[in-house]
Design a protein with these regions (language model features):
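A short beta-sheet element
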Residues: 45-46, 62-131, 255-256, 275-335, ...
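Sequence-specific dsDNA recognition surfaces
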Residues: 21-33, 48-82, 228-242, 257-286, ...
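Short amphipathic coiled-coil heptad-repeat segments
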Residues: 1-12, 178, 183-223, 386-407
Length: 407
């Protein structure tokens, strides 16, 4: 029966199945020389499709291209047009789509397919429909390729979708817009808290803002110290492909991909069956640091470990171990830390050695003031984490609704 599991009470009757060939007119986008990019009319590329899940607005479009008025007319994108990603390295991502919600004229790039409406629909409803599992499954199954996966106009024409009347589409669209607004508000709150934290860190570590002792007295002067004087840098585990397990057994080896936005993320796992020295078993309050990577921007990113699982860390990582780590973990998020990282990167390889890390020099307050600073910043982090969880819950709630409000 072609009706959704969740439905507004004012509506009944079956949704009608419609082929994309009857819903859209498809066209591939602009192919221009590299000299033509960077000026002219705005054009939608693959990144615009991926980075704007709630719809592409005029202001969100990054690129521009200098083409003739004739080319503009042929490749114009209008309000409500759907844009599809033509190719991807993975089948799961091919054919990702988005709707243009801007009123100003734009064009679209050669790695994109435009679907111009042949029948009237609500663009926000259509954007939600295209992100449901059933539509995504149809599109990915129709893609082809081996090293790269592609979807063409003919394949997209074979996709079918169930649509209600326009009035019900608009009702669903309004509901989805309200959910998106809630997520947007939470995201803005998260950004403001993060900015507040950065501002307070700037003031605290520059000593522009100082705490006082519990008795109201002033703390003493901060002292220059090297990281090697107050703690120890430890080199990670070297292992071979034959040590890696594929059945979930063995010890987890932490790598750079396990540090995401200052948090430990264990979703990307490599586990090994190998005898591990006690020294390179991660301890509570250890700081995990990326010390070697093909991407220079990842060097120096770190996270403090507060996890009960027995874990080790890879050879491209380092662990810093100190009784002052609650303070030092925040110190390693400051511009002063990353300035020293950039100054000491290897000439040929993107790396900082443990010996180099030991020479990094910073101003340190007494332990009592360190504790007050760490407690203050930790309280902000807890608020940021609560909002991050609320954002994720709201996204999952919306995703669940998408699967039930569409056929």
């Amino acid at each position: 029966m072609s009706v959704p599991k969740l439905r507004f009470k004012a509506f009944d009757g079956d949704w009608s199945e419609t082929l994309f060939q009857d819903l859209f007119i498809f066209k591939n986008g602009v192919n221009a020389s590299k000299e033509q990019y960077g000026s002219g009319i705005k054009f939608i590329n693959v990144l615009d499709i991926i980075n704007n899940p709630n719809g592409i607005t005029y202001d969100s479009i990054i690129g521009s291209v200098n083409i003739t008025s004739k080319e503009i007319d042929k490749n114009l994108v209008k309000y409500g047009d759907v844009l599809f990603q033509r190719s991807s390295e993975t089948r799961e991502e091919v054919g990702q789509s988005n709707v243009y919600l801007g009123k100003d004229p734009v064009v679209f790039g050669g790695f994109v397919i435009r679907g111009s409406a042949q029948k009237e629909y609500d663009p926000i409803f259509m954007n939600g429909l295209l992100k449901t599992d059933s539509l995504r499954d149809q599109i990915t199954q129709l893609s082809g390729g081996s090293t790269r996966f592609n979807i063409g106009q003919d394949s997209l024409s074979k996709v079918s979708a169930y649509l209600p009347l326009k009035e019900e589409q608009t009702k669903i669209a309004s509901f989805l817009s309200a959910a998106d607004e809630k997520i947007s508000q939470l995201t803005q709150k998260h950004e403001l808290l993060s900015q507040y934290k950065q501002g307070m860190m700037q003031k605290l570590f520059s000593q522009q803002l100082r705490f006082k002792a519990d008795d109201g007295s002033e703390f003493g002067e901060w002292e220059d110290k090297k990281l090697g004087e107050v703690g120890e840098n430890i080199i990670g585990l070297t292992y071979s492909p034959t040590d890696v397990t594929n059945d979930g057994t063995g010890i987890l080896v932490l790598r750079s991909s396990n540090i995401k936005e200052g948090r430990l993320d264990k979703s990307d796992q490599v586990r090994v069956n190998k005898k591990i020295q006690d020294k390179i078993i991660v301890q509570p309050n250890d700081i995990l640091i990326c010390t070697r990577n093909g991407s220079q921007r990842l060097i120096g990113k770190s996270v403090i470990i507060n996890d009960d699982e027995v874990m080790t860390f890879g050879a491209f990582m380092s662990v810093y171990r100190s009784k002052y780590n609650r303070f030092i973990a925040y110190l390693m998020q400051t511009p002063w830390f990353f300035e020293q990282v950039q100054m000491n990167l290897g000439a040929r390889i993107n790396q900082i050695t443990t010996g180099t890390l030991n020479e990094f020099t910073f101003d340190f307050p007494c332990l009592e003031e360190q504790t007050k600073i760490a407690n203050f910043l930790s309280a902000i982090d807890q608020k940021i984490e609560v909002v991050a969880q609320q954002i994720e819950q709201a996204k999952q709630w919306k995703k669940g609704l998408l699967q039930q409000m569409f056929v």
